[in-house]
């Protein structure tokens, strides 16, 4: 019964155990894996320790014994020692020296945070996200445990950024870029970038997400890229630009250009945004999956019908 129950969600497990007195005791043996927001009622349950994924809207008296995912939305620097995923409020802009416990694996700062981080990020952190106003020195301050790193709108310390980012980082997001991409470390394989790109993107990049605003200048997309995503603001002609190494191609919600002869024959998975209203009847035969918005109402040829997925 315990093994079968692993295929059920939290609510289904509780309903199952409530069907008879014999099964009622299973509540103390079931592991509740689905994410829940902690309430006083949940905290008082005799099987509270069996909740494995919880969000804390307040600091409880204790944490579930078997919890593996504990998220906390912090408004102050008082962080419980058992939190694994830490999210700071957008209004938080206090010093953080000594406030992030070693249990934390992911840290996301709010939009106005702009404090020194020297010696503040523990070696347990693997994902580190800075908000829009952060623009501090980072050299030597990001631990080698970090594999995913995000910088916001205000960060402009790009010169020799390859000296600032540890080699452990493989996924990098730059919300505003205005420099030569040669500064991007070659250890990065997943790059998200928004702004003007100068120079040549490193051949280490296999996953590229690109977005721009008022102006757009084509740059060279290396043939190492297999997964290409255009952001929500991108709405430009891509004919003769996308390399034939790309297999997964995603356009953002505002993209609405003609695609005839614009999709390379290497593409197998194609996704269009919410406002796309052009014909898809001329996509290459290599395309196996086409994702379209539920509001898309352009006629689709019969031979493509089985490839369409609505979202």
Model-derived features: where do they sit?
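Short helix-loop-helix/strand-helix junction enriched in hydrophobic and basic residues
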Residues: 2, 11-30, 47
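Extracellular beta-helix/beta-solenoid repeat scaffolds
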Residues: 103, 124, 145, 168, ...
């Amino acid at each position: 019964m315990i093994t079968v129950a692993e295929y059920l969600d939290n609510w289904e497990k509780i309903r199952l155990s409530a069907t008879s007195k014999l099964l009622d005791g299973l509540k103390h043996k079931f592991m509740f894996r689905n994410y829940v927001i902690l309430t006083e009622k949940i905290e008082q349950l005799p099987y509270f320790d069996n909740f494995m994924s919880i969000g804390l809207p307040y600091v409880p008296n204790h944490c579930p014994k078997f919890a593996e995912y504990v998220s906390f939305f912090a408004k102050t620097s008082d962080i419980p020692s058992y939190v694994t995923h830490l999210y700071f409020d957008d209004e938080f802009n206090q010093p953080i020296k000594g406030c992030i416990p070693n249990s934390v694996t992911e840290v996301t700062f709010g939009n106005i945070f702009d404090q020194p981080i020297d010696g503040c990020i523990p070696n347990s952190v693997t994902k580190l996200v800075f908000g829009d106003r952060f623009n501090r020195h980072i050299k030597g301050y990001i631990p080698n445990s970090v594999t995913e790193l995000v910088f916001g709108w205000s960060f402009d310390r790009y010169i020799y950024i390859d000296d600032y980012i540890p080699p452990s980082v493989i996924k990098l997001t730059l919300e505003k870029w205005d420099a030569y991409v040669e500064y991007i470390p070659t250890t990065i394989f997943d790059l998200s970038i928004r702004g003007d790109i100068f120079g040549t993107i490193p051949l280490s990049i296999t996953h590229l997400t690109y977005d721009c605003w008022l102006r757009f200048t084509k740059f060279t997309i290396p043939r190492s890229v297999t997964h290409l995503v255009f952001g929500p603001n991108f709405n430009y002609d891509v004919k003769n630009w996308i390399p034939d190494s790309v297999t997964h191609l995603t356009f953002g919600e505002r993209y609405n250009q003609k695609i005839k002869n614009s999709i390379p024959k290497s593409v197998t998975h194609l996704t269009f945004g919410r406002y796309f209203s052009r014909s898809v009847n001329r996509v290459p035969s290599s395309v196996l999956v086409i994702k379209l918005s539920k509001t898309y109402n352009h006629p689709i040829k019969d031979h493509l019908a089985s490839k369409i997925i609505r979202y």
